[in-house]
Structure formats: structure tokens, C-alpha cells
Swiss-Prot record:
The gene is rbsA2. The complex is composed of an ATP-binding protein (RbsA), two transmembrane proteins (RbsC) and a solute-binding protein (RbsB). Keywords: ATP-binding, Cell inner membrane, Cell membrane, Membrane, Nucleotide-binding, Repeat, Sugar transport, Translocase, Transport. GO terms for cellular component: plasma membrane. ATP binds at G45, E46, N47, G48, A49, G50, K51, S52. It is a peripheral membrane protein. This is Ribose import ATP-binding protein RbsA 2.
């Protein structure tokens, strides 16, 4: 994707010598950045490299910083995001800033609602405008539905629609595909190309390097708060980008030891999960088994029901779940997550920040929470053995290489990769028989991913049964021994790893309605 010289000369935004410090940390260190009109500029780097902080400065989230910002040649300093938006800069943050109890349309037009001559909000007009935005994005979302009732991927599309509604000159996308599937990603890329053709610019942050090579014109690499590389995308390959991002070459990215697979340890039969109104099956009669030392991968597109399947097994939806669960050949009854934990089942959820961690608690207390529930560190009279608690946490901080100043650090202050290690540590501490992993590497950098893969491999070698949901085909193929495919809540296929290709998995994952449409077009 070569930029023409005209666009190359037209600088839309320039940030000069930007430095941003937090107590004890230089998050952005003397970074200069140019954004050209009508380009897609990728910004890459590990978690903690300073990417999101730099973008929040450009978008007015952080008004206090050193350096200068020029927009179309004029110096600007935004005091808040609204000022940035009024000047044509929109940010889609990694952590979505949506209001759960408002509808998707109300979120899109929050504080910008269409009103009549009397100042009364014209809801019908707002719903129609939201529908047009969703149609442009190629997604089927009811503009009247509350955000809290939408899936994570649908919420992501609402955030993207909100940014498009601002008609910005520069749209900053921070990990926009971390929670959406392949089809939605392709649609988003089409939108990005349209924006580019309109002369608008996109700053695109992603850990998925294959996306960078597909959509970007230019790439900027950050490490430890500094800019360490920059240039047209044609000047980079995967290895060069990784080397710049982590400061060294990664010879082996997917670390999968060959574990000894023995007896069946876990089986589910006829799992069903009904919607809240009990009119629709979100999971429809799914059965599978896992053996000791085995990693069972579950692949599917967004809306396939994979997350719902794991949650149903874990007892997260009592009253709406049917089916049987067996551990070691013995049927167990799970009516709540507590029942699952007591029977040796752990769940690493897709959204670690809201479902996997208590962000305002320390690393120590997050790691030992299930151990307290299981009374593994509780002495007589219900008192916690604080010495044992500290020893357990220190051992996991060391074993999992969790980068934290101390066990008492608030977990919200850790990087995404280290937060995910804390979630894994809290389950490993109770020595589960089965661990359910839902998108275990979502939103974390390449180095942290490699460490998570190593941990998953070690779990399998130890004899644990591992069930791993992933939307990343290279990941599912590299880490799984067997792969189950889901579509529209149903199990559609099952493969041995050595007998399947990416094409096989995608074919099995496409919903039947889409397959029919595709066949008709071909005819």
C-alpha cells in the first residue's frame, strides 16, 4: 500500500516531543509523530509501550503533557475529549466507554441527540440514524436494545458506530477487533478503506500483526515509551516488527510441548442454554469430552455460542441451563460457579477486567480468592493463614513471571498480559482438574502471548484437561490437540489437529444461512 507523494506531503496532525509521566513512570518519552491525510497509520508495541497513553493525549483524555500538537498546521491543546471531537479527532478506546443502561442509539449520540425546535429529543430520528450506521458496518443490532444486553462484540461495533457518527478527520482505533470475529473485521476494514478514500486518517492499534500488514499504509513502533521504528509497511515483515517491539527475536512463538494424553477427565452431554426470555437456545445440545493432558480447542465466529457454552458449564446461568457434566466419569451437579470451583473446574473469562478480576483489589487477594472459597488457606475458626497465602502468591508471581512491584499492587495498575497471568494464577492455585479458557490471549502483546502459550502447555503436561476458546486460527491450530467447531449455538464439526486446515475450520464455522446465500451467489 504505497502512499502517493501528494498525501505524503500533506501532514494532517503532528505531535512533537510528547512526554507524559505518571507517578514513578515515564509512559511516553519524547515521541514525535506525523499523521498524513488519507492514510492508515498502524501503531504497534507491547502492552505498556505507551501507545494508548499517546493516543489519549491526542484525543484530549490527558490534557497535561510536555510537547506540542499541531492539527492542520495550527497548534492545539485539548482540555477534554469533547474539544478533540469538535476539532475532528475521535477515539475508540480499548476499554469501551459505553453506558450499559442506555440503548445503543443513545450511546452513539450521547450529548448530541437530535432535537426538535422545542429541545425535545427526536428518538425515532436517532434510531433511524443509528440503524444507518449499523447497516454501513454490516451488523444487525437493534438501536433500541440496551448496551448491557449486547454481546462484547456487538458493544465493540456500537463504539465504532459512535466514532463514525462524529464524522471525524482522524479516527483512533485502539484494539478495535479484539472482541469481534473475522466477518466483522473484514467489514471494519472495508469501512477503514472508505474513510481513507474520503481523505480521512485512521490510527490503528493492534496486537494482531496480520491485520497491520493487511490494512496499514505506514507503521510506527513503540517500546518502553519511545518510538523505536517507523516507515511504510512494505519495509517491514513479521519478524522485524516483533524484534522492534520486544527488543529481541522470537524464534518460537507458539510453545506447545507434547503432553501424554491418557484417560478421560471431563465430559459434558447435551448442554443447552436458553435466552433470558426462554424463546431461543443460545447453546443447543452440545456434547464433548476432554482427556488428561489434552487441549481441546473450540473455534467459531462471533455469535457461535462458545462463550455461552463455557459459562453454562461453569454454572453462570442457573435456571436456564440443561445437560450433564461429568468429572472422572462421575456426574456432578453444578448450580452455580461455586459448585464448579468446588468440583475442580476453573474459568478464565473472555473479559478479564469485569468477570475475571476485582480491579481495585491487590494481586495477592485476586490470586487467593478461589483458594479462600475452597478453604485451602483457611484455618480453624475461619481465619486465613496469611503466611501460607503470601507463600502461594509469591510462588506464582515467580513461576508465571508476573511483573508487579509487590503482591499488594492494585491489579488494575498491571498491563493486560500481567492481569491475565493473575487470572491464571488464581485458578492454578486451587489445582483444578479442568480449566476453561475463553480467549486467553485477547488484547495482550506478543511477548505475553508466548508466555501464556507456555503456561497452557505446562497445564496439559501436568495432566490437567484444558478447554480453550479462541478466534485466532493460528492459535487454535498451534495449541490444540483436538478442535471442536461451533456455529449458531451448535457443534458443527470436530477435528484432530493434524487432520485439519484453516479452510476446514472456517467452512465448519460459517452459519448455515450464510452458506445458503454464498451457494446461491455462486450459482
Amino acid at each position: 500500500m504505497m502512499l502517493n507523494t501528494e498525501k505524503e506531503r500533506e501532514v494532517l496532525l503532528e505531535a512533537r516531543n510528547i512526554t507524559k509521566t505518571f507517578p514513578g513512570v515515564i509512559a511516553v518519552n519524547n515521541v514525535t509523530l506525523q499523521i498524513y491525510k488519507g492514510e492508515v497509520c498502524a501503531l504497534v508495541g507491547e502492552n505498556g509501550a505507551g501507545k494508548s497513553t499517546l493516543m489519549k493525549i491526542l484525543a484530549g483524555v490527558y490534557p497535561d503533557y510536555e510537547g506540542q500538537i499541531f492539527l492542520e498546521g495550527k497548534e492545539v491543546r485539548f482540555r477534554n475529549p469533547r474539544e478533540a471531537q469538535e476539532n475532528g479527532i475521535a477515539l475508540i478506546p480499548q476499554e469501551l466507554d459505553l453506558v450499559p443502561n442506555l440503548s445503543s442509539a443513545e450511546n452513539i449520540f450521547l450529548s448530541r441527540e437530535p432535537v426538535n425546535e422545542f429541545g425535545v429529543i427526536e428518538y425515532q430520528k436517532m434510531f433511524e440514524q443509528a440503524s444507518k450506521l449499523f447497516s454501513k458496518l454490516g451488523v444487525n443490532i437493534d438501536p433500541k436494545t440496551k448496551v448491557e444486553d449486547l454481546s462484547t462484540s456487538q458493544q465493540q461495533m456500537v463504539a465504532i458506530a459512535k466514532a463514525l457518527s462524529l464524522d471525524a478527520k482522524i479516527i483512533i482505533m485502539d484494539e478495535p477487533t479484539s472482541a469481534i470475529g473475522k466477518r466483522e473485521t473484514e467489514q471494519l476494514f472495508n469501512i477503514i478503506r472508505s474513510l481513507k478514500n474520503e481523505g480521512k486518517s485512521v490510527i490503528y492499534i493492534s496486537h494482531r500483526l496480520e491485520e497491520i500488514f493487511e490494512i496499514a499504509d505506514r507503521v510506527v513502533v513503540m517500546r518502553d515509551g519511545r518510538k523505536v521504528g517507523e516507515g511504510p509497511i512494505e519495509e517491514f515483515d513479521h519478524d522485524k516488527l516483533v524484534r522492534l517491539m520486544v527488543g529481541r527475536s522470537i524464534d518460537q512463538f507458539f510453545i506447545k510441548e507434547r503432553a501424554t494424553i491418557t484417560d478421560e477427565i471431563f465430559r459434558v452431554e447435551g448442554i443447552k442454554l436458553w435466552s433470558l426470555d426462554r424463546k431461543k437456545l443460545l447453546v443447543d445440545d452440545v456434547s464433548f469430552y476432554v482427556r488428561k493432558g489434552e487441549v481441546l480447542g473450540i473455534y467459531g465466529l462471533v455469535g457461535a455460542g462458545r462463550t455461552e457454552l463455557l459459562e453454562a458449564i461453569f454454572g453462570a446461568h442457573p435456571g436456564r441451563t440443561e445437560g450433564k457434566v461429568f468429572i472422572g466419569g462421575k456426574e456432578i451437579k453444578i448450580h452455580s460457579p461455586r459448585d464448579a470451583v468446588k468440583n475442580g473446574i476453573g474459568l478464565v473469562p473472555e473479559d478479564r477486567k469485569t468477570a475475571g478480576l476485582i480491579l481495585q483489589m491487590s494481586v495477592l487477594h485476586n490470586i487467593t480468592l478461589p483458594s479462600v472459597v475452597m478453604k485451602l488457606i483457611v484455618r480453624k475458626f475461619g481465619l486465613i493463614d496469611s503466611q501460607l497465602e503470601k507463600e502461594i502468591v509469591r510462588s506464582f508471581i515467580e513461576k508465571l513471571n508476573i511483573k508487579t512491584p509487590s503482591p499488594y499492587q492494585i491489579v488494575e495498575n498491571l498491563s493486560g498480559g500481567n492481569q491475565q497471568k493473575v487470572v491464571l494464577a488464581k485458578w492454578l492455585a486451587i489445582k483444578p482438574k479442568v480449566l476453561l479458557l475463553d480467549e486467553p490471549t485477547r488484547g495482550i502483546d506478543v511477548n505475553a502471548k508466548s508466555e501464556i502459550y507456555k503456561l497452557i502447555s505446562e497445564m496439559a503436561v501436568s495432566g490437567m484437561g484444558v478447554v480453550m476458546v479462541s478466534s485466532e486460527l493460528p492459535e487454535i491450530l498451534a495449541m490444540s490437540d483436538r478442535i471442536l467447531v461451533m456455529s449458531e449455538g451448535r457443534k458443527t464439526a470436530e477435528f484432530l489437529r493434524e487432520e485439519v486446515t484453516e479452510e476446514d475450520l472456517l467452512k465448519a464455522a460459517i452459519p448455515r444461512s450464510v452458506k445458503v446465500e454464498t451457494t446461491q451467489r455462486e450459482e
